[in-house]
From Swiss-Prot:
Belongs to the PRA-PH family. This is Phosphoribosyl-ATP pyrophosphatase. It catalyses: 1-(5-phospho-beta-D-ribosyl)-ATP + H2O = 1-(5-phospho-beta-D-ribosyl)-5'-AMP + diphosphate + H(+). Its main location: cytoplasm. InterPro entries: HisE, PRib-ATP_PPHydrolase-like. It comes from Methanosarcina barkeri (strain Fusaro / DSM 804). The gene is hisE. GO terms for molecular function: ATP binding; phosphoribosyl-ATP diphosphatase activity. The lineage of its organism: Archaea, Methanobacteriati, Methanobacteriota, Stenosarchaea group, Methanomicrobia.
Amino acid sequence: MPDADLSILNRVYEIILDRKQNYDERSYVCKLLNHRKGMNKILEKVGEESIETILAVRNENHEEIVSESSDLIFHLLVMLAANNVTLDEIAAELSARHESMKRD
């Protein structure tokens, strides 16, 4: 099975960072980042998409799993960007965990 091109995650994250710096009233990301509820709105979306992903898995619906997981990952990227957490930091943490698992 070929490896997926995960560079899309970097591209989406970069767009989110751009929206964070350059407000556009038409942008969904800008609306999330500047919502009156603040971080709570983003957390609501992460929670909502988590539940929808869980339900898709429970229903064993492959298409829904892909769709809802994509929504969840997108909202996680928004949450990370809002908290100044980079994908490099996440990758480094995953790499460190992977290395420690190889030693076990």
